[in-house]
């Protein structure tokens, strides 16, 4: 528990004790401690007096006064208590206790803010999972940035996390990919009798694959149609996945598992899943197809598993895959999906319920659309290729750090306009530049301090820190651990980027109000230690969203 949570908990305990001493209530409702929007109303505030009105059958201001009269303020660093408005109890603290966060941050270093105990909860986080049929685009980029940041945050909060990419390598789109490669392969050999499929892939990469295979594997032309298609399927997927993995790796996005859909067919997982569903009585035959009774579990209708022609629907391997995830010992499954998958939520949850699995263990987060904006206008196509703008092009255009940060800044369930020009600006209007510049500025000050013979020390006299802006800055540092916890609990990486902006702003305000290096050696030592704690916090926070913390800019 961090020092702010400790103070809040102590306040709650003392308020509860005061209520009992004043005989206001035997069964005490939940006591909430909030941070007032206006600092004039104290450091913390509680509305418990108004909550107790019906129970105590007294005016809320009278109740508040009774609580204050019986309150022991010695344990929570309280220097003043006021009653405001209809009965709010406002607490003003002696904020010197906040300096305790300085040695803690310095001692813990790159582990500062992280949970010290495991939650003993296994989470499988699946994200990106783009079809291996072409380049990653801006929607995939947002999914990757949010997914990787969320994984980092969950791990920092004490969860056991497995990052997984589901390779869709068994569907019709892969057959179309193989037929497209086949047409380009024979075209490179001078045979134009193999036509591109109507919904084939016409990108330059497919032409290059065809040419490359024609040179390296001329023998493929003599294969049977079935064997040739199988070969092109595998080679096409391998080529696209190699390129995709390189793009993600360069984007600082990594996975523990690359799970192949084909494996579900090869190891019998799909057949076993269907048999289990049938055995449990949740499948039935109608209109020549096999259906799953998902409407028994809040889906709006039942879903087809096997079509009239004997082929599986897309839903069938997805069901087997999610059952497989549960059987691997995962307590919680989190899927990050594109906006076009919204209709999948209830059916996937229902499929797990058929196995007796609580559907609340599956969390599906829908990623809304991103618009790329330049000079106030939407940019839909690449000037270079004439196709949709790729992740690679975005990285080249604005840089990896800016791309990662901007794509994580907003709640995933909200639409987002990515301003390409702003992302490249070297000004305080650019959020990533503003945050990184704060870190670089601190590094510069620490370097100057070292040149003057002043080293970072946890033994500095922190009573020298009494500037209001310094106290505000320490409050933000002290909130880091609870911010990680909140971002993890709500699966909301943007809470961390919001925190980074607030922390950077608090530092810049302090820097503009107070000189760090002065003739007062003891005060300088205290401030140097404090800004090192801020630097560590900024570094750790930026790392959680996959962004570097430069020492100079």
From Swiss-Prot:
It comes from Staphylococcus epidermidis (strain ATCC 12228 / FDA PCI 1200). One of its GO terms (molecular function) is arginine-tRNA ligase activity. It catalyses: tRNA(Arg) + L-arginine + ATP = L-arginyl-tRNA(Arg) + AMP + diphosphate. It comes from the Bacteria. PROSITE patterns: AA_TRNA_LIGASE_I (PS00178). GO terms for cellular component: cytoplasm. SMART domains: Arg_tRNA_synt_N, DALR_1. This is Arginine--tRNA ligase. It is found in: Cytoplasm. PANTHER family: ARGININE--TRNA LIGASE, CYTOPLASMIC, ARGINYL-TRNA SYNTHETASE. The keyword Ligase applies. InterPro entries: aa-tRNA-synth_I_CS (IPR001412), Arg-tRNA-ligase (IPR001278), Arg-tRNA-synth_N (IPR005148), Arg-tRNA-synth_N_sf (IPR036695), ArgRS_core (IPR035684), DALR_anticod-bd (IPR008909), Rossmann-like_a/b/a_fold (IPR014729), tRNAsynth_Ia_anticodon-bd (IPR009080). Its main location: cytoplasm.
């Amino acid at each position: 528990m961090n020092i702010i949570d400790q103070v809040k908990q102590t306040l709650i305990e003392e308020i509860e004790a005061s209520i009992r001493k004043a005989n206001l209530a035997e069964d005490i409702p939940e006591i909430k401690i909030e941070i007032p929007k206006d600092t004039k109303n104290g450091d913390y505030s509680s509305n418990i007096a108004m909550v107790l009105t019906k129970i105590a059958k007294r005016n809320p201001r009278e109740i508040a006064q009774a609580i204050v009269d019986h309150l022991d303020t010695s344990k929570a660093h309280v220097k003043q208590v006021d009653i405001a408005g209809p009965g709010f109890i406002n607490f003003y603290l002696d904020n010197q206790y906040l300096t305790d966060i300085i040695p803690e941050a310095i001692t813990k270093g790159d582990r500062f803010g992280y949970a010290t105990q495991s939650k003993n909860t296994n989470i499988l986080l699946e994200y990106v999972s783009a079809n291996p049929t072409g380049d990653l685009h801006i929607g995939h980029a947002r999914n990757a940035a949010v997914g990787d940041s969320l994984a980092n945050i969950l791990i920092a909060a004490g969860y056991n996390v497995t990052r997984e990419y589901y390779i869709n390598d068994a569907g019709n789109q892969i057959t179309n990919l193989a037929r497209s490669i086949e047409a380009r392969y024979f075209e490179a050999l001078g045979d134009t009798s193999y036509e591109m499929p109507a919904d084939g892939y016409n990108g330059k990469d497919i032409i290059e694959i065809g040419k490359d295979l024609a040179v390296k594997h001329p023998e493929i032309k003599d294969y049977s149609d079935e064997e040739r298609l199988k070969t092109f399927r595998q080679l096409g997927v391998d080529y696209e996945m190699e390129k995709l993995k390189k793009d993600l790796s360069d984007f600082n996005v990594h996975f523990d598992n690359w799970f192949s859909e084909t494996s579900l067919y090869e190891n019998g997982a799909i057949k076993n899943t269907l048999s289990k569903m049938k055995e449990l009585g949740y499948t039935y035959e109608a209109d020549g197809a096999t259906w799953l009774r998902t409407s028994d579990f809040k889906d709006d209708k039942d879903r087809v598993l096997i079509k009239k022609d004997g082929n599986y629907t897309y839903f069938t391997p997805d069901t087997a895959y999610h059952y497989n995830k549960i059987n691997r010992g995962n307590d919680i499954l989190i899927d990050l999906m594109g906006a076009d998958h919204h209709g999948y939520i209830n059916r996937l949850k229902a499929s797990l319920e058929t196995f007796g699995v609580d559907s609340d263990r599956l969390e599906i987060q829908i990623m809304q659309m991103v618009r790329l904006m330049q000079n106030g206008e939407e940019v839909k196509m690449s000037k270079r290729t004439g196709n949709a703008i790729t992740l690679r092009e975005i990285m080249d255009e604005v840089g990896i750090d800016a791309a990662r940060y901007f794509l994580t800044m907003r709640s995933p369930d909200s639409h987002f306009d990515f301003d390409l020009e702003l992302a490249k600006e070297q000004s305080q209007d650019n959020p990533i530049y503003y945050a990184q510049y704060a870190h670089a500025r601190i590094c510069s000050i620490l370097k100057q301090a070292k040149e003057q013979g002043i080293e970072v020390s946890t033994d500095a006299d922190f009573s020298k820190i009494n500037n209001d802006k310094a106290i505000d800055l320490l409050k933000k540092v002290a909130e880091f651990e609870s911010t990680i916890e909140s971002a993890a609990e709500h699966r909301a990486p943007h809470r961390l980027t919001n925190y980074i902006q607030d922390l950077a702003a608090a530092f810049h305000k302090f820097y503009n109000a107070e000189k760090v290096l002065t003739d007062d050696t003891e005060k300088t030592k205290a401030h140097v230690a404090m800004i090192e704690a801020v630097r560590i916090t900024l570094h750790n926070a930026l790392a959680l969203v996959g962004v570097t913390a430069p020492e100079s800019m």
